[in-house]
């Protein structure tokens, strides 16, 4: 199984309840497509290096994932690009 780390930035003005639902939804997207979520945690609210969609800050969230193939990651990537609450995301394959 390959190990991946996903970091995504959530818009800072989202309500706590909506943020928790968003995180749960994207964790379930990964598990529904065959990946195993090892860890999913909020990092912190941080200042961005440059403005993204008129926001100067963002809520960072980190997810560690194990997957046999990249189907779950492709689906995560596709859906996070069209979700207005996620400002940016990055998927990195970790060395074994």
UniProtKB/Swiss-Prot annotation:
Q: Cellular component GO terms, alphabetically? A: cytoplasm; ribonucleoprotein complex; ribosome
- MF terms (GO), sorted A to Z: small ribosomal subunit rRNA binding; structural constituent of ribosome
Q: Name one Pfam family in it.
A: Ribosomal_S6
**Disulfide bonding pattern of the chain:** none
Q: Which top-rank group of organisms is this from?
A: Bacteria
Q: Which keywords does this chain's UniProt record carry? A: Ribonucleoprotein, Ribosomal protein, RNA-binding, rRNA-binding
Q: Which GO terms describe its biological process?
A: translation
Record's family?
Answer: Belongs to the bacterial ribosomal protein bS6 family.
The record describes the protein's role as: Binds together with bS18 to 16S ribosomal RNA.
Name-wise, this protein is Small ribosomal subunit protein bS6
Q: From which source organism is this entry?
A: Streptococcus sanguinis (strain SK36)
Query: What gene does the UniProt entry assign to this protein?
Result: rpsF
